[in-house]
UniProtKB/Swiss-Prot annotation:
This protein's record includes keyword Cytoplasm: yes
One GO MF term attached to the UniProt entry: DNA binding
InterPro entries (UniProt xref): YbaB-like_sf, YbaB/EbfC
Family note: Belongs to the YbaB/EbfC family.
Subunit-level organization: Homodimer.
Protein name per its UniProtKB record: Nucleoid-associated protein Ping_2276
A Gene Ontology term for the protein's cellular component: cytosol
Amino acid sequence: MFSKEGMGDLMKKAQEMQENMKKAQAEIANTEVTGESGAGLVKITILGNHNVRKVEIDPSLMEDDKEMLEDLIAAAMNDAVHRIGEVNKNKMSGVSGGMELPPGFKMPF
């Protein structure tokens, strides 16, 4: 099936892939994206690790009802989470050679 050299090469490539994945995950964790709702009236900036960095609310919304503002904040947060998910997917597909890997995938060595 595999020669010793072939198996060694396979292990080396797997270890390189794991290192590249670690680097990509670190880059993703430091990536900042902004989600918006209400045509930009509410903006939420999050990091790749999903920590919220900033919330911006247009002053004109302070006069409107509380329920609408809550909906806009939730929509902006969902947009930001979706965007960071896309960044994560794109970054990791480059590292994994296009293979879909499960979230949190780690090499067994």
